[in-house]
């Protein structure tokens, strides 16, 4: 690029010199020659000057186009190198993940919003009562359940390219897109050994209409060799419906296209058997609107929910928020709590024992309960303290609700800005 810039500057300098030389020649000819000769010389010099300037303009324009292309290509190359470095750095971060760091992440779990305390998640002996795997609150991303931005092993977002699972354009070994040509699996135009397309002529084959044993022409579909429209076992096109598969288009086990719905992973509109809820709720993996057992969203109403007013477990209240039950708008406690299903009030408060404010309120409630037992049933301070606990938890829920709404709004705006 520096060489082209230097050449361009030399051309500009040459243009200036030629302009000055032509002007001096014109002045000298006017002094030495008579009127007719002077006019003829001026006309001739003007013609030469115009032709030279025209040639220089053409050369300069052509070099400018070449230089612009070089600059654009250099910018694109730098951006691609930067993306490659960022991707390599991301992969290196995953490989060098330190689970003993300040912010802990259990093995096999990565996400932008995952947040764990200093408990070593991989050591089962150090997992306390509130660290029961299987259900996470708030923005935590447990293994086997991932949010929109989480990147667990074996399941990635639109642009990620992990080993074993790729997007639309990726070409991993063993799984290929429309134009890829892997060994053992071929597209329309591929020419692998032992399998040929329409025009291929492998050694030992026969003419167009011949029908040797074990090899068929025309529209025949022999076992083990398939043409463009053939449907071999284990591999189906977009519209093929093999036995045992389900979903909107084609869903073969082990190989999935753009619209395929493999077992255990369903899209927004897929309705596999045994699922429930408003949209798609497969067991073990949930989408944006999914409602797994023990975890309910905005509109779900599980049995035996907490009452909003008196903090008592009731049957199905409209605005109830049971402890241990977290949806899109429900706040987790001051510490990360795991559990299966929802918990009663006493267990929920006991699991919050590591928080100082809850611990202080619980001790105060115990002291007031002892005082009530000693003085008689007229003392009701213990009940008020437990009500204060419930109010504090409710404030946490409302605060988290607003935080999640603002985060979702930012994500939606960012997604809309991309398109």
Curated annotation (Swiss-Prot):
Residues 28-104, 113-140, 149-150, 159-160, 169-170, 179-180, 189-190, 199-200, 209-210, 218-220, 229-230, 239-240, 249-250, 259-260, 269-270, 279-280, 289-290, 299-300, 309-320, 329-419 form a propeptide. The modification Tryptophan amide is found at residues 110, 146, 156, 166, 176, 186, 196, 206, 216, 226, 236, 246, 256, 266, 276, 286, 296, 326. Residues 27-48, 120-332 are annotated as: Disordered. Residues 1-27 form the signal peptide. It is found in: Secreted. Its main location: secreted. In planula larvae, expressed in a narrow ring of ectodermal neurosensory cells around the widest circumference at the anterior of the larvae. In primary polyps, expression is confined to endodermal cells of the hypostome. In mature polyps, expression is strong in the epidermis from the tentacle level to the base of the polyp and weak in the gastrodermal cells in the apical hypostome. It comes from the Eukaryota. Residues 120-132 have a biased composition (Basic and acidic residues). Keywords: Amidation, Cleavage on pair of basic residues, Neuropeptide, Repeat, Secreted, Signal. GO terms for biological process: neuropeptide signaling pathway. GO terms for cellular component: extracellular region. The keyword DNA damage does not apply. Coiled coil: none annotated. Belongs to the LWamide neuropeptide family. LWamide peptides may be involved in induction of metamorphosis. This is LWamide neuropeptides.
């Amino acid at each position: 690029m520096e060489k082209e810039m230097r050449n361009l500057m030399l051309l500009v300098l040459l243009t200036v010199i030629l302009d000055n030389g032509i002007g001096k020649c014109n002045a000298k000819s006017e002094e030495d020659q008579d009127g007719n000769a002077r006019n003829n010389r001026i006309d001739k010099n003007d013609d030469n000057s115009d032709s030279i300037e025209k040639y220089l303009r053409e050369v300069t324009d052509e070099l400018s186009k070449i230089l612009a292309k070089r600059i654009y290509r250099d910018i694109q190359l730098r951006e691609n190198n930067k993306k490659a470095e960022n991707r390599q750095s991301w992969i290196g971060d995953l490989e060098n993940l330190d689970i003993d760091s300040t912010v802990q992440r259990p093995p096999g779990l990565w996400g932008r919003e995952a947040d764990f305390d200093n408990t070593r998640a991989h050591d089962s002996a150090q997992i306390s009562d509130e660290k029961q795997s299987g259900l996470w609150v708030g923005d935590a991303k447990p293994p086997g359940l991932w949010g929109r931005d989480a990147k667990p092993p074996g399941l990635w977002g639109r642009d990620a390219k992990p080993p074993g699972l790729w997007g639309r354009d990726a070409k991993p070994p063993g799984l290929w897109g429309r134009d890829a040509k892997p060994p053992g699996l071929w597209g329309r135009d591929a020419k692998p050994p032992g399998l040929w397309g329409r025009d291929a002529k492998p050694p030992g084959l026969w003419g167009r209409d011949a029908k040797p044993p074990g090899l068929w022409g025309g529209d025949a579909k022999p076992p083990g060799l398939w043409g463009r429209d053939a449907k071999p076992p284990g591999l189906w096109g977009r519209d093929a419906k093999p036995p045992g598969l389900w979903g909107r288009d084609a869903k073969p086990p082990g190989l999935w296209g753009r619209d395929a719905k493999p077992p255990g992973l369903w899209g927004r509109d897929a309705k596999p058997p045994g699922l429930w809820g408003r949209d798609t709720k497969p067991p073990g993996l949930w989408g944006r609107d999914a409602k797994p057992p023990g975890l309910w969203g905005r509109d779900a109403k599980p049995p035996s929910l907490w009452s909003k007013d008196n903090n008592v477990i009731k049957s199905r209240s409209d605005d109830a928020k049971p402890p241990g039950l977290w949806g899109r708008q429900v706040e987790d406690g001051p510490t990360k709590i795991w559990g299966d299903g929802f918990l009663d009030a006493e267990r929920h408060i006991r699991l919050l024992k590591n928080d100082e404010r809850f611990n202080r309120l619980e001790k105060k409630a115990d002291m007031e309960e002892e005082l009530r037992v000693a003085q008689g049933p007229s003392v009701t301070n213990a009940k008020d303290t437990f009500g204060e606990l419930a109010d504090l938890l409710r404030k946490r829920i409302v605060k988290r609700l607003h935080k999640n709404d603002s985060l979702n709004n930012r994500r939606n705006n960012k997604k809309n800005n991309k398109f």
